[in-house]
């Protein structure tokens, strides 16, 4: 299964290869390229297989984004009952797990299980993760945008206390008090 993207890429590359000059129309190139007769059917089969694998994963169509309201993930989990889903926070990630035991469907028996992990963006608090499940099977996970941090450095405003009249000169300590502070007793 891990080779499917590689094979699709190879099929695309072979489809673009041509043994005729670039100035001929594309349809002429397709007719003269001997590899295309082999690649066409293989490419169709690989695309069908990719669709089947994506559809059976249980959580296809998951979309995550960071918007003006914060971080949000939406995923289709319509193949699962609410009791078969678990959303949990682990460190700075949100884990979504869906699991249902073997059951019968239109094509036979099926078991589904998936685990998705979403790393929270820097600054987003894992304690504020919330999830909702719509009636049509769309699971939405939201984390509110963190408050903007204003960088003021070490600046702070010092309150001014109002007092009675003051003299502009600084009072000096009496000479004896200064000598006692220095440890010289007379």
Swiss-Prot record:
Comp. bias (Basic and acidic residues): 169-186
Top-level lineage group: Eukaryota
A GO molecular-function annotation: unfolded protein binding
PROSITE patterns in the record: SHSP
Cited InterPro entries: A-crystallin/Hsp20_dom (IPR002068), Alpha-crystallin/sHSP_animal (IPR001436), HSP20-like_chaperone (IPR008978)
Annotated region described as Disordered, given as residue ranges: 163-186
Any one of the GO BP annotations: protein refolding
Family note: Belongs to the small heat shock protein (HSP20) family.
Name used for this protein in its record: Heat shock protein 23
Source organism of the structure: Drosophila melanogaster
Protein's gene: Hsp23
């Amino acid at each position: 299964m891990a080779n499917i993207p590689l094979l699709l890429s190879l099929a695309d590359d072979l489809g673009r290869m041509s043994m005729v000059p670039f100035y001929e129309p594309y349809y002429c190139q397709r007719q003269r390229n001997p590899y295309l007769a082999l690649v066409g059917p293989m490419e169709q089969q690989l695309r069908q297989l990719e669709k089947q694998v994506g559809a059976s994963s249980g959580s296809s169509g998951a979309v995550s984004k960071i918007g003006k309201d914060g971080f949000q993930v939406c995923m289709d989990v319509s193949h699962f009952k609410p009791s078969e889903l678990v959303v949990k926070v682990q460190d700075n990630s949100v884990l979504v797990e869906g699991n249902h035991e073997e059951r019968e469907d239109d094509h036979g028996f099926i078991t589904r299980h998936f685990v998705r992990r979403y790393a929270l963006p820097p600054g987003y608090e894992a304690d504020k993760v919330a999830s909702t499940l719509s009636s049509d099977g769309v699971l939405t996970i939201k984390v509110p945008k963190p408050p903007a941090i204003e960088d003021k450095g070490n600046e702070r405003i010092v309150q001014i206390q109002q007092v009675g009249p003051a003299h502009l000169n600084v009072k000096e300590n009496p000479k004896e008090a200064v000598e006692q502070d220095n440890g010289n007793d007379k």
